[in-house]
Amino acid sequence: MNGKSQIAGAWKLITFEFRKEDGNAIYPYGEKAQGSLIYTEAGRYSAQLMRVDRPKFAIGDQMQGTPEEIEANYKGCVSYFGSYEVNPKNGYIIHHVEASIFPNMEGTDQKRFFELTGNRLQLKTPPFKLEGVKAVGILLWERLG
């Protein structure tokens, strides 16, 4: 079985945190973040993560929100898609980002270390600086269907 067939499918976010080297966790989209991740066997992916407590726009028009509504919603979600490749031997996935709500991600390759256990997929980022210390992003997904 190749790596793509192992992870292909639809996944629901269970938890998302940044774990700092001191062991403390930060929840960038709250402790009850929601998300969807889809991998196809053809090598495409789509990922969306967001806070559950984002404020609704008062007038119901997404193009007419107040600056505060727009800021809270933008800071409360991430969405990106593109192609991907899997290296099962070394335990990582590369997301080739084609488009993202955060334009600085576009054209980048995002490495994620993965562990697949039953119907759970854990993705971890390489270490990065967060608030002056090393941290790792940890996302736990559950396969749907």
Per-range role (PLM):
Residues 1-145:
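Lipid interaction determinants
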